[in-house]
């Protein structure tokens, strides 16, 4: 009875899953992700797992009217992305920017944005 489900699960582990690593760039306690300061070491460790392929990094910036803070967070992410891309050729995605800040994110190198409510406005 469980055999087909088990067989399907085995197929998942045979394929390499492409993932983005979410980083916590903001000081906002409501934001999640791996701490930005330890990201390079963490991503280096993840390279050992053959069933995942790190394709890039992502973040959600601070939700604030302080545009300088948001730009600083995006620029830190972009700098890290360029460093990682040089070290790991498979990394090709920098995902940052949502409805409220996607224009700043693109200005600072984002090549993937996550727009929700702005589509309906």
Predicted regions located by residue number:
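Single conserved hydrophobic/aromatic residue that forms the stacking wall/gate
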Residues: 1-13
């Amino acid at each position: 009875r469980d055999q087909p489900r088990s067989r399907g699960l085995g197929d998942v582990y045979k394929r390499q899953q492409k993932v983005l690593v979410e980083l916590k760039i903001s000081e906002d306690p409501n934001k999640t992700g791996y701490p930005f300061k330890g990201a390079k070491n963490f991503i280096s460790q993840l390279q050992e797992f053959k069933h995942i392929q790190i394709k890039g990094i992502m973040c959600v910036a601070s939700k604030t009217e302080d545009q300088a803070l948001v730009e600083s967070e995006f620029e830190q992410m972009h700098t890290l992305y360029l460093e990682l891309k040089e070290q790991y050729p498979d990394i090709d995605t920098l995902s940052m920017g949502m409805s409220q800040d996607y224009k700043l994110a693109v200005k600072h190198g984002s090549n993937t944005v996550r727009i929700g409510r702005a589509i309906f406005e």
